From Swiss-Prot:
Residues 173-238 form the HTH luxR-type domain. Disruption phenotype: A double sdiA/ydiV deletion mutant leads to decreased cAMP levels which inhibits quorum sensing system 2. Keywords: Activator, Cell cycle, Cell division, DNA-binding, Transcription, Transcription regulation. The gene is sdiA. This is Regulatory protein SdiA. Activates cell division by specifically increasing transcription from one of the two promoters that lie immediately upstream of the ftsQAZ gene cluster. Activates ydiV expression in response to extracellular autoinducer AI-1 (Vibrio fischeri autoinducer oxoC6). GO terms for molecular function: DNA binding. It comes from Escherichia coli (strain K12). GO terms for biological process: cell division; positive regulation of DNA-templated transcription initiation.
């Protein structure tokens, strides 16, 4: 790939994603780009930071229905190494036997369903959600695409597709809505630091009743049982 070819492609992609008005346009473009890179399927998976004990995971894909159903039935999400950010030490992640060494049932099932080669790129969103873009193919043969070219293109595709979906307020990328005032965020920051209501009142030069009022109001806004959960969610999603 010549530099001018990549930068021409990059300009085209940036314009396309900026002009998209629906999520369907985003997914259609991802599918088209996967095909141009000689891959048969794509999957865009978003893992949210909350709830902590059962994080919200959403995905959109053109995988065969049989594979999606089998994957979900076997709860492969819990062991899938391509959705573990710790594995991305060198940019994009190529699927191979070593990667799936601790998830052999998943790897064997994927190949049995026709997924013999794949690659994944991930990105952290401003709301701390993790987005994983995967391309996979049925053929086991090597593809004539340089690793650097593939990585650069997938980096742009995962970034621009997720940013477009955020701009469109698509549910796949949106975390729980937390519309807090400036004062509420101030109180949240001190709550996250472990300060009591009385201590926060002294720091901000307001009454303790005012602090408690704001904390209760924030709990109502996100249906949280206590102020600790509000502060934890706000920190986990990058609000404070």
């Amino acid at each position: 790939m010549q530099d001018k070819d990549f930068f021409s492609w990059r300009r085209t992609m940036l314009l396309r994603f900026q002009r998209m008005e629906t999520a369907e346009e985003v997914y259609h473009e991802i599918e088209l780009q996967a095909q141009q890179l000689e891959y048969d399927y794509y999957s865009l998976c978003v893992r949210h930071p909350v709830p902590f004990t059962r994080p919200k995971v959403a995905f959109y894909t053109n995988y065969p229905e049989a594979w999606v159903s089998y994957y979900q039935a076997k709860n492969f999400l819990a062991i899938d190494p391509v959705l573990n950010p710790e594995n991305f030490s060198q940019g994009h992640l190529m699927w191979n036997d070593d990667l799936f060494s601790e998830a052999q049932p998943l790897w064997e099932a994927a190949r049995a369903h026709g997924l013999r080669r794949g690659v994944t790129q991930y990105l952290m969103l401003p709301n701390r959600a993790l987005g994983f873009l995967s391309f996979s193919r049925c053929s086991a043969r090597e593809i004539p695409i340089l690793s650097d070219e593939l990585q650069l293109k997938m980096q742009l595709l995962v970034r621009e597709s997720l940013m477009a979906l955020m701009r469109l307020n698509d549910e796949i990328v949106m975390t729980p809505e937390m519309n807090f005032s400036k004062r509420e965020k101030e109180i949240l920051r001190w709550t996250a630091e472990g300060k009591t209501s009385a201590e926060i009142a002294m720091i901000l030069s307001i009454s303790e009743n005012t602090v408690n009022f704001h904390q209760k109001n924030m709990q109502k806004k996100i249906n949280a049982p206590n102020k600790t959960q509000v502060a934890c969610y706000a920190a986990a999603t990058g609000l404070i």
